[in-house]
């Protein structure tokens, strides 16, 4: 069901949110091993964490500050805290997200 992750990752607790992910909690941050099926769209939203992510399979179409950026496999992106953004996934996509609490 969730991404192509090693068995140790698949033993982590599941994230209880609007997408599928395994969640690793650490002091001051969370690490999510997320999977998005093709056709997923997450509408504009904000959050109070400073987010960095790397695409490990597929592609993220990130809309932020009126600009659309395609983030491909192996590439990193950054979404600052409290900035409106949206995400679209045209193909099955896995990513590792780092959420840093302010």
Q: Language-model segments: what does each one mean?
A:
Residues 1-28, 32-33:
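A short, N-terminal "cap"/entry segment at the start of jelly-roll beta-barrel domains
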Residues 30-47:
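Conserved short histidine dyad/triad with adjacent acidic residue
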Residues 49-60, 65:
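Glycine- and acidic-residue-biased ligand/ion/polar-headgroup-sensing regions
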Residues 56-57, 72-73, 91:
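A cytosolic small-molecule/anion-sensing beta-strand core signal
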Residues 66-81:
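Short acidic-glycine-tyrosine-enriched beta hairpin
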Residues 81-102:
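Ligand-binding loop in jelly-roll beta-barrel domains
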């Amino acid at each position: 069901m969730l991404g192509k992750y090693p068995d140790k990752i698949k033993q982590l607790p599941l994230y209880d949110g609007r997408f599928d992910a395994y969640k690793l909690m650490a002091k001051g941050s969370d690490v999510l091993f997320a999977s998005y099926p093709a056709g997923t769209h997450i509408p504009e939203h904000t959050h109070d964490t400073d987010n960095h992510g790397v695409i490990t399979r597929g592609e993220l179409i990130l809309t932020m500050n009126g600009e659309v950026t395609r983030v491909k496999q192996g590439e990193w992106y950054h979404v600052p805290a409290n900035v409106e953004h949206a995400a679209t996934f045209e193909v099955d996509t896995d990513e590792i997200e780092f959420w840093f609490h302010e």
